[in-house]
Amino acid sequence: MKADLERVYTLFPRLKERRNAVAGYLSGGEQQMAAIGRALMAEPRLLMLDEPSLGLAPQIIDQIFETIVALNKEGRMSILLVEQNASLALDVADYGYIMENGRVVLDGPARDIAGNDDVKEFYLGFGESGSRKNYREVKHYKRRKRWLS
């Protein structure tokens, strides 16, 4: 158990600094790190993460996702990541799913999904020319076609 705790402290050095703090007084990012660390202490075969970037500062998001990538490369466990930031999720995933209204409408290798023109336009903010769109230019869910007919 002590080795597991040291592993968590290695992954999240900030937690070691704050180890005597009450969890409720930790920042949002520190709370997310503590939640992931607590899960890792159980040595799971499947780590499920629901919106790990929600409400966090970009610097903390980067740190958490670097840790997710490192955990994935270790190969000790599978990771199921639910994330609304599609670009970030597809960057770290091997395989991806897109859901609409509770149904899987597209799945495949993450790089194939990220390369799909509809996904680029509707979820990643790219226009037909391949350039990033301004928020005002993005189509607000008025699609030419639906995923499911």
In which residue ranges do the predicted regions lie?
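Short, glycine/charged-rich "phosphate-handling" switch motifs in NTP-dependent
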Residues: Y95, D107
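A short, proline-enriched helix->beta-strand linker immediately N-terminal to the Walker B motif
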Residues: M41-R45
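ABC ATPase nucleotide-binding domains
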Residues: F126-S149
